[in-house]
Amino acid sequence: MALKDRFDKIISYFDTDDVSENEVHEVQERTSVQRDSRAATAQEASQRSHMTNSAEEEMIGSRPRTSTYDPNRQERQRVQRDNAYQQATPRVQNKDSVRQQREQVTIALKYPRKYEDAQEIVDLLIVNECVLIDFQYMLDAQARRCLDYIDGASRVLYGSLQKVGSSMFLLTPANVMVDIEEMNIPKTGQETSFDFDMKRR
């Protein structure tokens, strides 16, 4: 009897809720929209770099070509390249002005409803976004699997996964430091809590 219970527990770990075809199509549509937006972003970046390169070529190409030797020609070309480079790249100022121009950090709030949503959360970590994950809409077994997947991905990507609530976790990339003092997490109606070790209770 104990052996049968153990097999049932192992099998239930890999079971997921039945996914309807509508949900499958919905997931496929979301992934195609995400791919399109990523492709558009990459295309914009390549256009910007192409515009910068073409501006430099126009500066160089607009000068008349002379066949006479000019000893200062190479020096002038170097100065022009340096000036073009300095105009294209932002200047680094002292620490006070850098603090004022601090880069904004966004935190995405996700409520995964099925295991497949874990990939979307990991994709956000890949692009260095912080994610606050609340597993309140998932079953216990699915939430454990999802958390296991996210924890593994965060370790591969050198991110950090920290528990901040009874069913909430904060996923941060490597360049974000989170200072959480010990918190006493109140149990607000939810009796189960998820833990990193994924042990069955």
From Swiss-Prot:
Domain of life from the UniProt record: Bacteria
A biological-process GO annotation: FtsZ-dependent cytokinesis
Gene3D superfamilies given in the database record: SepF-like protein
Gene Ontology CC: cytoplasm
Swiss-Prot/TrEMBL keywords: Cell cycle, Cell division, Cytoplasm, Septation
Listed Basic and acidic residues bias regions: 27-38, 72-81
Subcellular location(s) of the protein: Cytoplasm
Region of interest called Disordered, as start-end residue ranges on this chain: 27-99
Record-annotated disulphide pairs: none
A Pfam family: SepF
Ranges of biased composition (kind: Polar residues): 43-54, 83-92
UniProt cross-references to InterPro entries, sorted A to Z: Cell_div_SepF (IPR023052), Cell_div_SepF/SepF-rel (IPR007561), SepF-like_sf (IPR038594)
Assembly description: Homodimer. Interacts with FtsZ.
Classification via PANTHER family: CELL DIVISION PROTEIN SEPF (PTHR35798:SF1)
Its job: Cell division protein that is part of the divisome complex and is recruited early to the Z-ring. Probably stimulates Z-ring formation, perhaps through the cross-linking of FtsZ protofilaments. Its function overlaps with FtsA.
Family: Belongs to the SepF family.
HAMAP family: SepF
Protein name, UniProt field: Cell division protein SepF
